[in-house]
UniProtKB/Swiss-Prot annotation:
Its EC number is 6.3.2.9. Keywords: ATP-binding, Cell cycle, Cell division, Cell shape, Cell wall biogenesis/degradation, Cytoplasm, Ligase, Nucleotide-binding, Peptidoglycan synthesis. The keyword Lipid metabolism does not apply. GO terms for cellular component: cytoplasm. Belongs to the MurCDEF family. It holds the Pfam family MurD-like_N. This is UDP-N-acetylmuramoylalanine--D-glutamate ligase. Transmembrane segments: none annotated. GO terms for molecular function: ATP binding; tetrahydrofolylpolyglutamate synthase activity; UDP-N-acetylmuramoylalanine-D-glutamate ligase activity. The lineage of its organism: Bacteria, Bacillati, Bacillota, Bacilli, Bacillales.
Amino acid sequence: MKKIEMYHHKKVLVLGLARSGVSAATIMHKLGAFVTVNDQKPFSENPEAQGLLEQGIKVICGSHPIELLDEGFELVIKNPGIPYNNPMIEKALKLKIPVITEVELAYQISEAPIVGITGTNGKTTTTTIIHHMLNAHKENSSLLAGNIGFPASAVAENATSDQYISMELSSFQLMGVQTFKPHISVITNIYEAHLDYHTDRSEYVQAKWHIQQNQTADDFLVINWDQEELKNLTKQTKAQVIPFSTTQRLEQGSYVQNGNIMFDDEVIGSRDSILLPGEHNLENILASVAVAKTLGVTNEEIMYVLETFKGVEHRTQFVVEWQGRKFYNDSKATNILATQSALKGFKNPVVLLAGGLDRGNSFDELLPFFKNVKSLIVFGETADKIGRVGKIAGIEVHYVDDVEAAVPVAYRESAPGDIILLSPACASWDQYRTFEVRGNAYMDAISELIEEVEK
């Protein structure tokens, strides 16, 4: 970790505990700052709070007292999930107190260069593939950070200059960056999402675009050339642009030609030998190849990863084949586009489990993708909205309380050869703490179903 002096004896407020807040508070304390942590949940729901108190860090739990900001803080580090229209954040900005997220701190202390990956969909899978490719190369090693793995600042604290940090970044994290500068930035794609957090689509796009705002001509921007919006934005960057495309041959960058994965004019390997299923994963693969080639990973090392990588948990994850039915867990599908992508990947009839937090979407965009859906099982706040679209498509719709209740209904409505797919098209927070918890609940329910039927 770089021993920076800029926070020594500075008063710092960390808003929100969770993993990133604990990491930021601990590191700031080590850097000599006077740290206060504030979380809305009570002490009884914050097991990390006691550990911070034992380090000598002040902790206030149970509410966000607005008067706390009158205590002369010189910096606020906010949890990414706290929106900028939160009264605490609005007051901090009014008082001209800088507000950052934990990834900014990670960059400031990191000795290792950062490969930062963002996008509406595919960023977790892309980050993971890049991580594996860099670790497959004898001269590189990678640490996984950000929304996947460990908090960015915790990873940066222990990273060395001969490593890379493969860092997944959300728009929530990027919106507040000031000096953050990855050596390589990746934007997988941009679609409409998180409009409950951002004021409009323009703000969302700009938050994603912040990933490259401090890059120079010595840095690289890997970007989806199939999206005109992103293509046009590249005119504004100082970084070297490396495009990727699933639809066209490129003079430089990564693309597909004659069944082969290409980079510039070089054949990397056959697409048929790639283990990861689904058309939607091709973007992720091409973006990863562009990063790997830029950092000197060989074709053999790249293909070894692509021939062995089975995917990431909760992302179109194959769970089990039982009684002729294949169960898939796509709990990470927290928006409509992700569910569209999942449905496109299956040719067999699908029993779809969907629903979750209501962010104001109509779900009409799912209609063209329901051709292979034979039965729809809905739950959560959006059950009625998604169910309405299913009825328009002429699909039989079943309403249940939650994911656990959906599994036996899905089995009853399916037949040998069918796909049973959890792909909610919604965030989990109306019923489950995270999409991982929701996905695990689904897989546990499958295990219970099998045990019950086979008694």
